[in-house]
């Protein structure tokens, strides 16, 4: 008997347990859907913070008998609770908007393997049984596909914790007829991807979209001899490296995307920010209603007067109504030098009385105002144990 045989036997047992865990997680999600249906009838909020905290406390107590530490149980069940909350939110939204689509065509930046492609898959997995992929070369093409009916939804990045706002997308939001109907966040884990055996010092040219280069500039500064070559998406960079099949070429992108192109990870990169997260927006031709049982966001686009304090006056309206603003972004108005538009994300349902009152006041003091959309907030703040 070789020394590896006991290890293989143990791994087989672990694999069998993993399959049992998957089956149990599927059963738990099915029960979460039943809970969502019950809340739909009783009109109770999706989130019950007291129940979530009591659940964590009970599981931590039970875990001690199995020698499982509190941190491990907390992290594991926070993720399970998040999935339950988002699953119930999707259920309530489908019922309210009478949408139960079997499939949808989603437009995103880049071919398969781009971060936008991964975000589109994430959104589709929770909302549709199937989704038809429609990769685009430019952000403008994504908007055009949905505006003209070639696609049902657009998934576009709007901001990143490391490189900041995606200005091209903000500019397109100024003029589009589309409405924001959803959001999601994707953790970005960049890797140096190569086609075969090589090392970091052998690489001469690195391909990627401008965003990964910005987000990983500290890492890249260690290799000043690398030539930086910009591509329209991370997946386009991967395609180039796969086709070149050279030890001197590499791409910056995700491990999952690299696998789709037959690339392997040479190095996992530490981005400039410890948490490198990109927020994506989902847009459609028709605005949606958001259940008052679900935490909501409303995104506005306003233009204020040129007089001193005009923006402050607008923001005071939100404060006076106890509305929480989670994002404020300014962009120039094309054709009007030195004038700016302001994008505001507000934690409120568009149809709520307080939001309607605030909109009325804002309409009286701003030069223009546009509601870009009201949509369910995907930021499920984890509950900590007592």
Q: Model-flagged regions — what are they?
A:
Residues 1-386:
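Domain-level signature for soluble enzymes in the chorismate/prephenate branch of the shikimate pathway
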